Regions:
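Phosphate/NTP-binding elements of NTP-utilizing enzymes
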Residues: 1-179
């Protein structure tokens, strides 16, 4: 049900309040692979820091491309030094891009026009990015021109009352609980 919501064109915003180690990052990557290969959408994911984003690209994204034949077929650059294969961006032969950026700098929320914006470990992001706004406020601006805009946020909650994923979920019109 969670991945169905993430992949549905009829649901614009998905907030996943989760416990630790439930596989949210893997679900997010699976849905992103679907968006890139099947729905041909540009995607972007933010992690709390540039280091987190770089590590995520190396340890999660690159093995995902390697292990999914339909994605690997769109990545002739895989395993090679190439302008379409960097630590912040992967450009596929279908013209679609995948960006993975840190969430601390306001510049990382500019210039990209994507269809899907994702946030992994939203509770670990700064509440205000360089006095320009919250990560979701800045990031969701990137999907405003999309025909099928999608914002997917997920995190294990931190301090009650100050947690961004808790706030995002409380602002949602619907709340589903899975036991």
């Amino acid at each position: 049900a969670i991945m169905n919501a993430m992949g549905s064109d009829y649901i614009r915003e998905v907030n996943v309040v989760k416990s630790a180690r439930v596989g949210y990052s893997k679900m997010l990557l699976g849905v992103y692979a679907y968006f890139i290969e099947h729905k041909q959408r540009n995607t972007l994911i933010w992690l709390p820091t540039d280091g987190d984003a770089e590590n995520f690209m190396k340890t999660h994204v690159e093995p995902t491309i390697r292990d999914i034949p339909s994605l690997l077929a769109l990545a002739p650059w895989y395993g090679k030094k190439h302008r379409d294969n960097t630590l912040t961006m992967k450009r596929f032969t279908n013209g679609r891009g995948f960006w993975c950026l840190g969430g601390k700098a306001a510049k990382n929320y500019r210039e990209k026009s994507v269809d899907v914006a994702g946030y992994d470990e939203l509770a670990a992001f700064d509440e205000d990015i360089e006095q320009e706004g919250s990560p979701t406020f800045l990031g969701d601006k990137r999907i405003e021109g999309s025909v099928w805009p999608k914002s997917i946020r997920g995190s294990t909650p931190k301090v009650r009352g100050t947690c961004q994923i808790e706030r995002a979920a409380s602002e949602s019109p619907l709340f589903m609980r899975f036991h």
